[in-house]
Amino acid sequence: MKTLVILSSILGDRSNSKQLADHLLARLKQSEPGGTVKIRDLAADPVPYFDGATVGALFTPAEARNAQQQRIAALSDDLVAELFDADRIVFAVPVYNFNLPAQFKSYIDHIARAGVTFRYTAEGKPEGLVQGKQVLVLIARGGKSEGTPDDTMTPYLKQMLAFLGMTDVTFIAAEGMAMGELAAQEGLALARQRIDALSLDARQGLAAA
């Protein structure tokens, strides 16, 4: 299988969400020795935030773009191509102030492309085009808000990913990362256990074993 990993924490190797991604990748290395992994770190190599030039480039037909617009659109095209090429997509996302990092939101803006990753039917209903993917969202959160109104990021990501066609999505959160060393270690351990309990068979989708 081809696995695409999107990292988004600004903390690099000290990132708790990256630790979860590393744990998953170690498991995949054993269970899928013939698989391939592509890692994109949005903090180390950020995608540009949306501006007028970006919107103009993406909404200009490819054959009508000037040289600058071609360069701008090429990055978005590459990000989208990675999505379609992958069998499994892993998003490692920390929670910053109740929501996702700005660099991850910018990434979403680049991959949400009308006519490319989603379209509208004749009835005006949206149809996601990034289909048939296993998606795993690994979250690191300072407090403990899973399943409460304070968790505003998970509902947004569920809606956004479904809008793009990604419906086989599993969320695993390491909570309590800012509640002291003991709570953080317990939160990471529980999240690792949940990762270990996953069935990663592409034919079955992501499910607890």
From Swiss-Prot:
Q: Give the disulfide map.
A: none
Q: Which SUPFAM superfamilies match?
A: Flavoproteins
Question: In terms of domain of life, where is this protein from?
Answer: Bacteria
Q: Which reaction does it catalyse?
A: 2 a quinone + NADH + H(+) = 2 a 1,4-benzosemiquinone + NAD(+); N,N-dimethyl-1,4-phenylenediamine + anthranilate + 2 NAD(+) = 2-(4-dimethylaminophenyl)diazenylbenzoate + 2 NADH + 2 H(+)
Q: How is the cofactor bound?
A: Binds 1 FMN per subunit.
Q: Which InterPro entries match?
A: Flavodoxin_fold, Flavoprotein-like_sf, FMN-dep_NADH:Q_OxRdtase_AzoR1, NADH:quinone_OxRdtase_FMN_depd
Matching Pfam families: Flavodoxin_2
Cofactor(s) required, per the database record: FMN
Q: Which UniProt keywords apply?
A: Flavoprotein, FMN, NAD, Oxidoreductase
- Keyword Ribosomal protein among UniProt keywords: no
Provide the E.C. number(s) assigned to this enzyme.
1.6.5.-, 1.7.1.17
The question of whether Acetylation is a record keyword is answered with no
- The top EC class is oxidoreductase
Q: Which GO molecular function entries does the Swiss-Prot or TrEMBL record give?
A: electron transfer activity; FMN binding; oxidoreductase activity, acting on NAD(P)H as acceptor; oxidoreductase activity, acting on NAD(P)H, quinone or similar compound as acceptor
Question: Where is FMN bound in this sequence?
Answer: 9, 15-17
Biological function = Quinone reductase that provides resistance to thiol-specific stress caused by electrophilic quinones.
HAMAP family from the xrefs? Answer: Azoreductase_type1
Family per record:
Belongs to the azoreductase type 1 family.
Subunit info here reads: Homodimer.
Q: What is this protein called?
A: FMN-dependent NADH:quinone oxidoreductase
**Which organism does this record belong to?**
Bordetella bronchiseptica (strain ATCC BAA-588 / NCTC 13252 / RB50)
List the taxonomic lineage.
Bacteria, Pseudomonadati, Pseudomonadota, Betaproteobacteria, Burkholderiales
Gene giving rise to this polypeptide:
azoR
